[in-house]
């Protein structure tokens, strides 16, 4: 199977396609304004994992955060204590009966053993092993979720006594991954293994480190999302399309109320015809890229 070299939202340095048609602004992480007269919602595409001191905060973003009465996230990452998160991961991400090495081609098993301690992940489900493996380069470069945009914004919003809301729970997210067809999970893991072994083949929507430079410049991949849709349609549908449609429905309801709200979700959710800006524009709202 032929895979695209890069997919925005995952570890990658140079993105091949840009999301166009929304206008341009000075280089900064991408943000849109959705409005209908007395209501406005800002959409900000985050990176969940960043290195310390990544210079992503801009005066415009800070003004929007100050103005917003409600601040949205994919999930409330600050609400899960380590023990609860560990239990969720064990419930949805482990498979004591089917070793990973029995599910992968021999070449992938050999490559995986060179990349990590196979014994530690042998009884993880493929999606969980892929997620852990894809995060290792970011961690090695000093990036953490604690310094990521989502948790940084959450702390700021709470300190300013904003209403903090989430589209999903952490369990919703774990259940979504666990519900992927086994073949899609294995394809995802194989892609991550290949990427670590030979360089980028398919950049999947969980972000290690080097996308940071492109994200800071406001760049979003379009062709890469198309590649994901073609090569792993079940993952594309579960991770992006269905969630984006559900979130757009929620936000359309919010547009019935006057005021300003701020949405912070992974940057990949902003890309392409199934991205939040396009979905809300299709509902008749004015959508403009402001950063």
Question: What is the meaning of each model-derived region?
Answer:
Residues 22-27:
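Sec/Tat signal peptide C-region and signal peptidase I cleavage site
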Residues 16-19, 60, 280:
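Hydrophobic alpha-helical segments
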Residues 234-291:
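A cross-kingdom marker for long, charged
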Residues 28-235, 239:
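Structured, acidic catalytic/metal-binding patches in enzyme active sites
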Residues 1-11:
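Bacterial N-terminal signal peptides that target proteins for export
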Residues 9-21:
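Bacterial N-terminal signal peptides
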